[in-house]
Amino acid sequence: MKANRLLLSLAISSAISSVAMGQEQDKWSPLETVTIIGSQEQARRLAGSAHFIGANKLQQFSYSDIQRIAREVPGVSIQIEDGYGLRPNIGIRGVATERSGRITLLEDNVLIAPAPYSAPSAYYFPTVGRLSAIEVVKGPSAITQGPFTIGGALNMVSTPIPTEMAGNIVTEIGQDSTYRVHATYGGRTDSGFGFLLETHQWQSDGFQNIDRSNQGTGLDVEDYTVKLSYAPLNSNHEIELKLQYANQDSDQSYLGLTDNDFDNSAFRRYRLSELDNIQTEHEQQILRYGYAFSSSLTLSATAYNNEHQRSWFKTEGIDFDGSSNAQDFDRTSWFNVVQAINTDSTLNGFTPSQLQAILDGASDTPAGSIQLRSNDREYYSRGVQLGLNWDGVIGNTTHNVEFGIRIHQDEEDRLQLNSNYSQIDGALALDDLGILGNAGNRVQKADAIAIHIHNDIQVGRWTISPGLRYEDIEQKRTRYRDGEARSFRDSRENSTQVFLPGLGVLYQVNDELSLIAGAHKGFTAPSNSPGVDEETAINYELGFRYQSGALSTELIGFLSDYDNILGECTASSGSDCVIGDAFNGDAATVAGAELLISADLASSSDVNIPVSLSYTYINGEFDTDIADTDFFGSVSAGDPLPYLPDHQFLASVGFEKNNFAAYLTGNYVDEVCVRASCNAFEQTDNTFTVDLAANYQFSAALNLYARIENLTSEEDILGRQPYGARPNKDRTVTAGVRFNF
């Protein structure tokens, strides 16, 4: 199977190459019509915090994991889970990291989470290895992007249609039977037609090992993109169609390890997770139209449709007495089992050694005692967004006005199944398949209208950027009985209307130094839970930017003053709550500072020694006491917000001479509390990870590269949710070739 996939990928690449060899091999430059910022130079001009990571920067390490890319942006927090970034946990400026559900995720400036309003957890994430740029906007800069505006937005830019006929093939192999192929070909004709063909294939057996099993713990990802465009010469019109399809088959689990087992073998997995597997399928259609009324006034219109299906079959818990049918299962979470062993406590009359024997597979369990759930969900996210941009001069002020409106609808449809198994001789045996819908039978839906207006006003050395966003959201959840027959059970609704003002200011002291300040009201929708308020915070930032030659420095302090911090129950949170419910967390405060320094230390004209430092300090805590809740637990004022490291930094140094380049990075992240109580075994380890990459440019067309991730083979607990200690990825060596034509 794997060999056939590799041959298929190489065949696709070869076919693209053979067609392209007859075409001109001129260099092309990417279009930037789907970006928020467009370049790092443009980011420095904004009256708010923003960062741009372009293609050249991405190629230094050629990562396929968004978490290893995004960590270089100050203010970004990451909770490692599977080691590959398949379903990443990313937060910005202290918002919750879980499933990246508190930041606005976009691909090509279009909402990309499976259901951004009704179910924002990112169980789909774009294949990072095919992207051409990454953008992060924070503070007042994020007011044009919603619905999550407290932390900010992450926009992923896909491969643009080349301006001339050109192609690219990247092939790499690595440890754990890993391979990756990325191939593109396309261009534009003199008549105005353009096209792009693209495929990305990625496979690995995984870096973890399941007890007494040959089952892999890796992934198998296929991704295909087609773009067609028409922009006639001497015309003010342009149209582009994007079609994208991706599927994934990965053997990922929520079941972690006890601390003692982690210390003995960090990359072990209990055989109880042998059947755990997630399969996903994603389809996207985007139609864009642009019209230039004049050189200063342009209109854009985008219609989009995203459809996503996922089926995650994984172990959920244990009923120590066993259940004759799957509907009567009395579940104890694996988290409680792991914690009982960690704390040397009994659980349901079982001693720690008896519990350990169950995890080890050394003890048989009663019939129907192990629960596995088929977490089947279908999503759609669709809508239309219009934009109007005007650049002009009024008196002695210049204006860049952006007006946008988005009409959006999304839905999550759950029809899930609990099945009962028993553990016999260290392996799982099915006892009762269960009745479809016994683990969730509901549809939640959202209709939203979002409007924003933003104006960059330049007066002398000043740039003043006021903005206003309006969100009108209607949400509904309907629950059903009787499986696929779906007889009505109950429903609930919630509606939200909110105005979100913001203001950013930049003062250009001189050609090298600028000062920035800003404030805006941030917002997160409250889901469909009645009586739950929206998450709101007043956000402030203040800092400066300095650039002189190759030296660039940015220091920004930020403060988020929450009126109400929101908690949303998901399976990955590990909390004892109903999945999909939201909870008020009352007041909280997040304060911090972001530092970014880059320079070139070389004194020779033919050598570059680029160095950079990205540092983030964050302090987040609850401001009020909260009685015991299913999500937050018991909270006292001053308790820390979970998964927020106080200190983190990424330092890098490179060496570039003629056709050779090498880069070394070191990433440090403080330990974090995984729950507000921060009791024993509720903290991660601090960690320092080193990556090394090198490449050699043999010609304009051929580049060879190699990469070592986790050079020193660190083994640290980077997560404990939902069911035990989780590791970072082991040391991994990869080699690849990049061919341009």
Residue ranges, per PLM feature:
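Membrane-embedded beta-barrel scaffold of Gram-negative outer-membrane proteins
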Residues: G290-A292, T298-E316, Q508, S514-G518, ...
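Transmembrane beta-barrel wall of Gram-negative outer-membrane proteins
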Residues: A166, I173-Q203, R212-S253, N277-S294, ...
